[in-house]
Each structure stands twice: as C-alpha cells, then as structure tokens.
C-alpha cells in the first residue's frame, strides 16, 4: 500500500474560500496535487476516475472565480464531481466514496451546501440551473448560476429544451460545455484563447446590451435586423454557432487545462454577463494519469487499482455476468434472424450490445443519451417488421416512459426491452437502482413482463422475446454474476404467462419473481427444518400472471409470500389484485408481499442492501413466522 501523496498547497484548502487566497501562479501546482489526491482516493474505493481527472483545472477555476456556495455550481451527471468534493470540505471522507455510510459518488443536496442540485442521470443541469437563475432574478439577488455539462449529455433533448428556454427568457445563466471528446471543435491555441478573452470582455459583451436597448427604444420590428448586425460583428471574432441562434452569448472553444485561459474568461463573464452565456471548454478525459490517458475508456469507471501501474483489481468470476449472458444470447439469435436489431442509449458496453455491434455493426444503433428517442426509434423499426431489442438500464428506462406508453404499448408494437441493472446496484446508490420498471410496465395493457431467476432463464427469455411478435415484451435482470447454473446451448421459447414450480411443499408457498429465487430456496430449507414444508415457485411473468399456478398455491397452502426486487406496485401487487378479485383471500390465506422498502436506500454492497430490505433468506423466513405468529425463538434457532 502506497503512502498518501504530498500535497502542501492543497492542504491549505478546506473550502473554496481558502482557494481564493492562493495566487494565480500557484494554481497549476494545486491542480497537480488535487489530481494526485483524487487518483490515490479512487484507487482505494473504485469509481468514476476519468471524468474527474478531466475537470481538475476547470473545477479549481470555477471555485476560485465564483463565490460558491452563494453562487450555485451544478454538475451534470456528477461523474466528474470528485475534485469538487475534495475542495468543498469533504476531503477527509473522500476515501469513503461509494461505500456504505460514505460519500455519494454523485452530487447530493443532503451531503453539502456546495451541492445545490443532486445529479446522476444526464442532461438535467441546464434546466435546474435555469430555475435557480430565474429564482435569483425574482429574488433580486446578484447570485451567479453555473451549469457544467459534458458534450455527451448534450445529445439529450432535455438539454436543448433548456437552452431554448434560457435563451427565450434571457436569463443570467452561465453554461460551461465540457467537451472532453473534442467532438464539437478543438481549440486553436493562443489565438483561440485571445479571441475567447476578447469575446468575454466588456466591449464585445456590451454589444449585445446595446442591441437590446436599441430594440427597446425603436421597437421589435427592427429586432431581427439589430440582432443580425450585432452577431455579424461578433462573428468576425467568435464565429456563429447554434448556441447564438438560441440566444446564448458563445465563448470558445478554450483550453480547459490552462489557467491562463480559464481564469480571465471566467472573470470576464462573472463581471460582465447580463444574459445567458455558453463557454465552450475542451478537456481531456483521464488527464494527468498515464494509464487513464492510454485506456480506451479513459478509466471512466474503475475498480480499485494500483496507482503505479494502473492495474485494476478484478476478482475471478464464479459465473458469467447477466449482462454477458444476455449479450451472447442476443448475438446467437441475431445470427439466425437478420430482422433482429439492437439499440442502446450511449451504453454499448454497459448493456453488452458492443458484442452485437462488433459482429453486426449495421444492425446495432447507439443513439446517444436519448432514451425517449431510442424507444420511439425502436417502435418505428418494429412497425416495419424488424425485431428491435432496446437495451436500457432500468433506471434509464424511466426517462422514456411516455414513449413506451404512447408509441409502443398503445400501438401494440413488438419492441423488446432487455432491462439491465434490475434491483439494487450497490455503489451507485438510489439514483441507479432498478426499482420501478415492473410496476410501470405491468400496468400497461398488452405488455408482457418477465424477470429472469438465473442466467439460464435469461437465455430462455432472450429467445422468447425474439420469437414473440404479438406486442411489447420486457425481461429484467440484475447487475453482477449469475448463480452458476448449467447453461443450455440455446434458450428455449417459454410459454407466455406460465411459471414453474421448483420445489413442492404443503404449508408455505414462496412465489419469486426474479433472482431472489436462490434466497427462496435457502429459506425453504430452513422452513422445512422448522416443520413447515415449503413450495418454491418461479413466476417468470408479472404479466400475464400464471393464474393456474397462483390459484394452486393459494388453495393448497396456509401462507403465500411473493418476493421481488422491485418497489411496491409491481409483481406482488398484481398477485394481490388477482387473489382479491377471485375471492382467494376470503378463506384465511395469509399473504405477504416482500418488495424493496419505500425509501431511498444509500449505497452499500447489494447483499447488505437486500439484507436490510428483508429480501434475503433470513428475512423471508422471518416474514413467514410473523405471518403464522410463530414464537420468535424459533427464528433464533435458525440463525
């Protein structure tokens, strides 16, 4: 284990107010020390390293120039917030990042006054910032609002909706576009920096104000002519952009790793901006750490690693991951059916669709961070006879729900939805938990909703979805490894709406939807030992329910427990509704529904989170005993 880095200047900075006492000439050293501290911390915890390394100078410059937390600083997504946390009173806890009882991996309002708006999903910063900027104007304060958004997040429609509204409102909002893929335009050295300083200065920014005053004096009829004249003059210096068309004063691109470029531009904007300003800053993801700079993903998300070599610690898997099983099964089906296409919203490796992309690039579509578009794009493909697999994380499917309802479900289009990261996801906490998809999909008429109990079942569900053309169909599966079951050579086509009984009993029935099946089997052993012969069933489907299976369990057992990795309103609610409507609750059946708790659970290891939620074997046994009013001592005997 290496010693912590030597950081004499950074040691003087507890809060941004301390940073403002440091001379400009010493800022590059502070940046080096901050980068070293961040690398060392993430080597211990794992996390999102590359994005933070890319914004070290930018984060320092913003906190030095602006009066945070009075001035509001909002980071989009939040992957890049680790340097910000170190500078805002949280350095002593930085090695608890993403750990149980530790710092969140994202900005979080409850954690610090320097986090005015929480984030984790993309493209929200400009909308939130605009709300805060308008609030400042309504409150007649001089508060500045700065939103930092990456070029990737700009692919989402919400970002452009906010830009359009901000321009129309002429709000005092500063948007910093962090272009870390050089996908928009590279800076052009000293001349670019000079022009950016010039464009952000009082003279050129004043031209816009002159235009506004002339419009007010002479009337709106000549508004467009004045605007064209002002922007034409500015165009000789800065070049016209779409941002200017939306009403923003555009500065840049500038070098996001140069304090000589950043500090004067930010100071000019702070002192002179009267309306919306967009500063285009070019940075390098992974900057300053050779292994990250050399890696294809720039160390976007890493496990713990050796600081010297960059080698990441990866435990040898006991079974293939669910994501890998899905990817391999989809490739297998795609080889046999040229109508199968894959769609991802900027997550090809996370969803496993990169495997399909490598083999069938013409049939794989990465639409960017645009889940709404992804869903309706898939609907269009389905309408023309193709078989789209729109692979999204559960938490991101939420972003396209209206499209699922309006464009897919109402029209009965056979879009396939592989839903990754179902249930608790561990270190990423509540913003990334897959809690709600079962509830919001099972409520839609004509939707088939499945959950895989293990990796073999997942393979069956991929083939089932590929073969199903009657309407939309989904199947959910968690992050992480499978349970190590024997894998079929190819998946089977499952009968729609039919579950299976895994183990027969007579007193207690455990009906599982998803991967809690393994815990149900462990619980059944304990219940059998306690004299409660237990049936274990795998529902497979939340919609349509296996009515015959549920009737059988209800009529021949004293207790029926539904178990799922989702929020209330999902599978268990569907079962209870069916039981009530058929009168199966009228004769003494004790039914309990185990779901994710009705609260936002902070990050921890998934096993710990499920234990706290009562969704492990012990929690299931406890629920059965409580339902039967058994003596608590019996529970202790099974511990």
UniProtKB/Swiss-Prot annotation:
Gene of this entry: dxs
Protein name: 1-deoxy-D-xylulose-5-phosphate synthase
Catalytic activity annotation: D-glyceraldehyde 3-phosphate + pyruvate + H(+) = 1-deoxy-D-xylulose 5-phosphate + CO2
Binding residue positions for thiamine diphosphate: 79, 120-122, 152-153, 180, 289, 371
SUPFAM superfamilies registered for this protein in UniProt: Thiamin diphosphate-binding fold (THDP-binding), TK C-terminal domain-like
A GO MF label: magnesium ion binding
CDD domains: TPP_DXS, TPP_PYR_DXS_TK_like
Cofactor(s) the protein requires to work: Mg(2+); thiamine diphosphate
Enzymatic class: transferase
InterPro entries: Dxylulose-5-P_synthase, THDP-binding, Transketo_C/PFOR_II, Transketolase-like_Pyr-bd, Transketolase_BS, Transketolase_C, Transketolase_CS
Enzyme Commission (EC) number: 2.2.1.7
Family indicated by similarity: Belongs to the transketolase family. DXPS subfamily.
PROSITE patterns in the cross-refs: TRANSKETOLASE_1 (PS00801), TRANSKETOLASE_2 (PS00802)
Pathway this chain belongs to: Metabolic intermediate biosynthesis; 1-deoxy-D-xylulose 5-phosphate biosynthesis; 1-deoxy-D-xylulose 5-phosphate from D-glyceraldehyde 3-phosphate and pyruvate: step 1/1
Single biological process term from Gene Ontology: glyceraldehyde-3-phosphate metabolic process
Subunit-structure text: Homodimer.
Role summary: Catalyzes the acyloin condensation reaction between C atoms 2 and 3 of pyruvate and glyceraldehyde 3-phosphate to yield 1-deoxy-D-xylulose-5-phosphate (DXP).
Cysteine disulfide partners in this protein: none
Cofactor binding note from Swiss-Prot or TrEMBL: Binds 1 Mg(2+) ion per subunit. Binds 1 thiamine pyrophosphate per subunit.
Binding site for Mg(2+): 151, 180
Keywords: Isoprene biosynthesis, Magnesium, Metal-binding, Thiamine biosynthesis, Thiamine pyrophosphate, Transferase
């Amino acid at each position: 284990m290496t010693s912590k880095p030597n950081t004499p200047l950074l040691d003087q900075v507890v809060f941004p107010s301390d940073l403002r006492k440091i001379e400009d000439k010493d800022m590059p050293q502070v940046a080096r020390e901050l980068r070293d501290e961040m690398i060392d911390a993430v080597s211990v915890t794992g996390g999102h390293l590359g994005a933070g390394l890319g914004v070290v100078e930018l984060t320092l410059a913003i906190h030095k120039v602006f009066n945070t937390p009075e001035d509001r600083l909002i980071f989009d997504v939040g992957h890049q917030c680790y340097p910000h946390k170190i500078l805002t009173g949280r350095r002593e806890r930085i090695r608890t990042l993403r750990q149980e009882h530790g710092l969140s991996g994202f900005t979080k309002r409850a954690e610090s006054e320097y986090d005015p708006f929480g984030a984790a999903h993309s493209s929200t910063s400009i909308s939130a910032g605009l709300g805060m900027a308008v609030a400042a104007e309504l409150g007649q304060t001089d508060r500045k609002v700065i939103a930092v958004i990456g070029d990737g997040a700009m692919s989402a429609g919400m970002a452009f909706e906010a830009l359009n509204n901000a321009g129309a409102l002429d709000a005092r909002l500063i948007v910093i576009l962090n272009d870390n893929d050089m996908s928009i335009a590279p800076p052009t050295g000293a001349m670019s920096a000079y022009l950016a300083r010039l464009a952000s200065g009082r003279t050129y920014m004043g031209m816009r104000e002159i235009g506004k005053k002339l419009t007010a004096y002479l009337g709106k009829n000549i508004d467009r002519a004045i605007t064209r004249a002002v922007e034409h003059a500015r165009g000789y210096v800065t070049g016209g952009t779409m941002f200017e068309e939306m009403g923003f004063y555009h500065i840049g691109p500038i070098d996001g790793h140069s304090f000589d470029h950043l500090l004067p531009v930010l100071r000019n904007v702070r002192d002179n901006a009267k309306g919306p300003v967009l500063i285009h800053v070019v940075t390098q993801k992974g900057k300053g750490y050779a292994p990250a700079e050399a890696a294809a993903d720039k160390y976007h998300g890493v496990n713990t690693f050796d600081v010297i070599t960059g080698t990441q610690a990866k435990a040898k898997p006991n079974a293939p991951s669910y994501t890998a099983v899905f990817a391999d099964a989809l490739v297998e089906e795609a080889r046999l059916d040229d109508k199968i296409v894959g769609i991802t919203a900027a997550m090809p490796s996370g969803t496993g669709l990169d495997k399909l992309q490598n083999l069938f690039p013409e049939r794989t579509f990465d639409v960017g961070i645009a889940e709404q578009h992804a869903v309706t794009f898939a609907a269009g493909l389905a309408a023309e006879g193709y078989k789209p697999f729109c692979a999204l994380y559960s938490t991101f499917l939420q972003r396209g729900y209206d499209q699922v309802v309006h464009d897919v479900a109402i029209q009965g289009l056979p879009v396939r939805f592989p839903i990754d990261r179902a249930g608790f996801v561990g270190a990423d906490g509540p913003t990334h938990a897959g809690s709600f998809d079962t509830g919001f999909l099972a409520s839609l008429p004509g939707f088939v909703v499945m959950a895989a109990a293990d990796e073999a079942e997942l393979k069956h569900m991929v083939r089932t979805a590929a073969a199903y053309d009657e309407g939309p169909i989904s199947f959910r599966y968690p992050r992480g490894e499978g349970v190590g079951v024997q894998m079929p050579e190819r998946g089977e086509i499952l009968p729609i709406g039919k579950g299976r009984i895994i183990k027969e009993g007579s007193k207690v029935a455990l009906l599982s939807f998803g991967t809690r099946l393994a815990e149900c089997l462990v619980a059944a052993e304990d219940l059998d030992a306690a004299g409660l012969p237990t049936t274990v069933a795998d529902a497979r489907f939340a919609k349509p329910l296996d009515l015959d299976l549920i009737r059988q369990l209800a009529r021949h057992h004293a207790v029926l427990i539904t178990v799922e990795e989702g929020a209330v309103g999902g599978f268990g609610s569907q079962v209870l509704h069916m039981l009530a409507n058929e009168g199966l609750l009228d004769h003494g059946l004790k039914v309990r529904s185990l779901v994710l708790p009705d609260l936002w659970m902070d990050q921890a290891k998934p096993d710990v989170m499920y234990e706290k939620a009562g969704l492990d074997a012990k929690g299931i046994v406890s629920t059965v005993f409580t339902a039967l009013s058994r003596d608590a001592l019996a529970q202790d005997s099974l511990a």
